[in-house]
Amino acid sequence: AAVKYSKKFFEDVEFYPEDAGRADQDFLCKMVEEVIKAGATVINIADTTGYNLPEMYGKKIKYLMNNVPNIDKAIISVHCHNDLGLATANSIAGLQNGARQFEATINGIGERAGNTSLEEVVMALKSHPDLNLDTNIDSKKIVPISKKVSRLMNMPIQRNKAIVGANAFAHSSGIHQDGFLKNRDNYEIINPEDVGLKASSIDLTARSGRAALKHRLELLGFSFSKVELETIYINFIEMADEKKLLHDEDLYELMKKYK
């Protein structure tokens, strides 16, 4: 009745079967069939408690696609929660099995542990073009929008948050830094410019190696021999042990004795 009533006012009527993630498959199919008959155009399959594993959720979507006679008259949408940290994986599993809409939020904001992270799904699909699930979203706006939402909602972004966290494109381990400087593809699958950043960053810490230090010093205009670099590196490590993260002003201070 609610769907029929809504249809009097709106062409697009979306129906949410609450806790569909744990619902009986056949009961869910009958319900979906009836609401489509009543005029629903989108069926949001809600994993309300974040209970499902990706394989379970994907099978649920596939079962609906194969067992609801009038499923072609509506769009199946996925709506996942992150209670087990699986909202992104579950959403992608749903899309792989026939869903053609996913509901998500910037930075994964949402009830309890949050909802599906928009930026994660967008970049996962972009990184796997073989899935043929292009969102047509301008990914270069991801980081600016993420920062704006964080500021307006007064909700800091976790530093190691995928895609938009401060550490997402930062390299601090010496081995990683050396490999990254030789070929970015060694340690990055996403170009930072694709999400609205100017570049990746090399964080200089006590874990950094000679390659990263040499790279940064040369960018600052310093020149030195290979032998001199060894002495500079020893002093750098001593400073890094004390200050944890070194900035350009620290490097200028470090290099005063080598002018």
Where are the regions a protein language model picked out?
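Short, ordered loop/turn segments at secondary-structure junctions
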Residues: 18-20, 47-50, 81, 106-108, ...
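A mid-to-C-terminal "edge-of-domain" accessory segment
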Residues: 123, 130-259
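Alpha/beta enzyme core
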Residues: 1-76, 92-99
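Phenylalanine-focused residue identity feature
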Residues: 9-10, 15, 27, 63, ...
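Structured core elements
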Residues: 14-16, 42-44, 75-79, 101-105, ...
